[in-house]
């Protein structure tokens, strides 16, 4: 048992109707009562009712709720909550699904215009400190002379050919299907109005709009991120009966030579010498704030290649919550050149540094004594190519793989 049968009765189908039967019933009602075919108020009301009924009964989830709880149950389940008031918004969408694009009349009431989007480029320093830019915008505004009418007061008449819609519909029947095509009115050229040439506004020549150049101050706030939007509400092009869209500036962060950004944090790759890495010392870096940071490494703390450390509060500003992110330091170690010191000094290093790790080789294993040679990518690419192998892309790949010369013992 269903709680209510109202929507079924409107479409003239039983409560056991299939989806196909409901669709056919709505199609029949839409053809009969659509405002473009039947302009009477009674037909308009019946079309709204049929559209609301089909909106519910064509959706399995909404239909199930309606069957169990009636219209009251739909108000809490994203349903219509009764018939929609005013206009033919969603009913027209359903109608167009059956009969092709252009089934609906032009939407009533003011429409929203398109947004105007621009990219604003900013360096990491500018995103840290903030920046204000003055940008010129060429936009369309309502004519000040005629206040957007296009002519003298009382001289603008509604186009009788399209009934002020600016569009016309052509209906064709192709077999059992009806197709409707929407075209621009050839009398008013889509404006919906007729203005006698002698009464046209001399400033805009009846176009109702004119061009204006406006300067906008764009504030890039400290801590803004790549892709963030700065919106000027209602500053896009104006047109009669149109709500102006927005002017939107999209922040584009330029790459930095020293820093990378990770959310509110900054990442910096610091190269230090081997002595500083193992015995402590200092290094310095120029921060995006413009200040220099002197960073100390405590003696006794060993910095390994690729190790990461953090300096708290030296990242990017955090706009919503205040404070700053962190500065993450990733270390690379600059090793000395070959033969940088004497054998005597190397022996002293042996006494200072932890003992060497002795390789563990099984007693009965066959041992080859090998010597490392410098790796030359060009040389080994030629060798591999002659064997049909792949080339090395860089000297960072497979380091030393074929740079070992062995002599059997």
Curated annotation (Swiss-Prot):
Sequence segments annotated as region (Disordered): 382-409
Describe the protein's quaternary organization and the partners it interacts with: Homodimer. Interacts with HAP1. Component of the HMC including HAP1, SRO9 and YDJ1.
What is the protein's name according to its record?
A: Mitochondrial protein import protein MAS5
The J domain sits at 4-72
Primary location group = cytoplasm
The record places the cross-link (Glycyl lysine isopeptide (Lys-Gly) (interchain with G-Cter in ubiquitin)) at 198
Query: Which segments cross the bilayer?
Result: none
Could you read off the lineage of the organism from its UniProt record? Eukaryota, Fungi, Dikarya, Ascomycota, Saccharomycotina
